[in-house]
Swiss-Prot record:
This is N-succinylarginine dihydrolase. The keyword Hydrolase applies. Substrate binds at residues 17-26, 108, 135-136, 210, 248, 358. Residues 17-37 are annotated as: Disordered. Transmembrane segments: none annotated. It holds the Pfam family AstB. Belongs to the succinylarginine dihydrolase family. Homodimer. GO terms for biological process: arginine catabolic process to succinate. Pathway: Amino-acid degradation; L-arginine degradation via AST pathway; L-glutamate and succinate from L-arginine: step 2/5. It comes from Myxococcus xanthus (strain DK1622). PANTHER family: N-SUCCINYLARGININE DIHYDROLASE.
Amino acid sequence: MREYNFDGLVGPTHNYGGLSPGNLASQSHVGEPSHPRDAALQGLEKMRFVSALGVGQAVLPPQPRPSLHALRALGFTGSDEEVITRAAREAEHLLRLTSSASSMWTANAATVAPSADTADGRVHLTPANLSQMYHRAIEAETTHSVLRAIFSNEKYFAVHAPLPGSGHFADEGAANHTRLATPGHAGVHLLAWGRSAWQDVQGPSRFPARQTLEASQALARLHQLDAKSVLFPQQHPEGIDAGAFHTDVLAVGNERFLMLHELAFVDHAGLLAVLREKLGQDFRAVVATKAELPAKDAVKAYPFNSQVLTLPDGTMAIVAPIESRETPAARQFLERVVAEDTPVKAVHYLDVRQSMNNGGGPACLRQRVWLTDEERGAIKADVFYTPALHDSLAGWVRRHYREVLRPKDLQDPQLARETMTALDELTRILNLGSVYDFQR
């Protein structure tokens, strides 16, 4: 079984809308000009780098934005141009919400369980409903369509519908999920949550907790996971209030290794004790304290929103944002991870600033899917990374993406036409078929 990182292509409407309360980077860059072409090329460069390390790499397409489907559902009628013009005039905030390129953060696209862990021996995928934020909730339908197109062979894959789109079952996807495993032990799934729909638990006071316990429990049932191999740790309210709106802002795990901040989970010490019992002596964890790495620095530099990757030689490497190198406390923590008795032997720093400015580091940009060779062969879409695909996608970006996008540019109907033209071509490049509503 091999891990594949399905990275989200940054969409043509990448902009700084400041749409997510609790996402400090998003709020601090609101209204600034963005650079969609650079953003997409930075994402492709990360894919190239990860693939060159010998790690499985694939791609997921962006979604059509502005979402004319969503705007029409909100009462704007007429031609595409009339819908956009009227929304810009009457409810500019709705145009911003429906123009977000946030689907690039595919860690929120779905939660995935490998066939080795599921009762029916299939890979299970559930698109996240993302119901807490409107600009993200409108992604779920298209995500479901895309995943069904890629993972279409029902002998190997079970693609579920998103959980019911209510606050009771608010689901943020794999950004709150970690799978750990050691040789000779069953994989352990951490399905974290920040609040409960029915239980009285202490929550954050400054920023909203997005994922519910009930959603995490439903995912475990849908994916047919053994109850003994699932843990439901609560996100630390203080961590959420510091800006860790998803678990992957303060924790990241891979196979037998977990690195986390002490504010990632309530009772992290108790959680680690249970993990050692379930995973055995090969399990390794490194904890950053508030004294060593203040939460504000962790949220600013995103050392935990790194990718921890298993290399072909069995060692691990961290792919971190360049901000982690530029922030002394974050850099020193990552250096300690390498120096200690862990599988991690190297840290690589990459420039994904266009995404970071909106609150998304390397880990946000990828969805992990574990596949056997047979399962990999059952996927017929051309989504797996090759140098030839890289060149094709880079050329596609340069042909279709604007160099600079300013807030007022979202009001230009031509932008929607450019995006649909680009995505129509992309579905042919990736051999996806008609996955978008404008293609049907």
